[in-house]
Amino acid sequence: MGLRAGGTLGRAGAGRGAPEGPGPSGGAQGGSIHSGRIAAVHNVPLSVLIRPLPSVLDPAKVQSLVDTIREDPDSVPPIDVLWIKGAQGGDYFYSFGGCHRYAAYQQLQRETIPAKLVQSTLSDLRVYLGASTPDLQ
């Protein structure tokens, strides 16, 4: 699976992350409601992620994640990324959560971040962005 916006998309270890079975949020234990049943984790280039909402960060939390990623990267859950195909086949990768993890990987100057890709539609994106939803090609 390739990315149009540059870089490559590699698997970061299928099955890594949340154990099987439903958790309190309806997804797998430790997973999100979006990606709870998705086992595959990919290394997604930070450069292709679209983050349309500004983050409010706790610097201490970011530093804690930086330390954890350095010591035991597998203990940090992957972020969820909405993967949307545009009208003309373009690939778009939207990330709304995981702002502290995203900032930690940026601070570490990593080129990629572990992510679960959630195949989504323009209608799904409209839930997040409303009238600001772009016309994806």
UniProtKB/Swiss-Prot annotation:
GO cellular component: cytoplasm; cytosol; endoplasmic reticulum membrane
Catalytic activity, as annotated: S-hydroxy-S-oxy-L-cysteinyl-[peroxiredoxin] + [protein]-dithiol + ATP = S-hydroxy-L-cysteinyl-[peroxiredoxin] + [protein]-disulfide + ADP + phosphate
PTM-bearing positions, type Phosphoserine: 32
Compositional bias annotation for Gly residues: 1-30
Region (Disordered): 1-34
Binding sites annotated in the UniProt record for ATP: 98-101
Name this polypeptide is given: Sulfiredoxin-1
Source organism per UniProt: Homo sapiens
Gene behind the chain: SRXN1
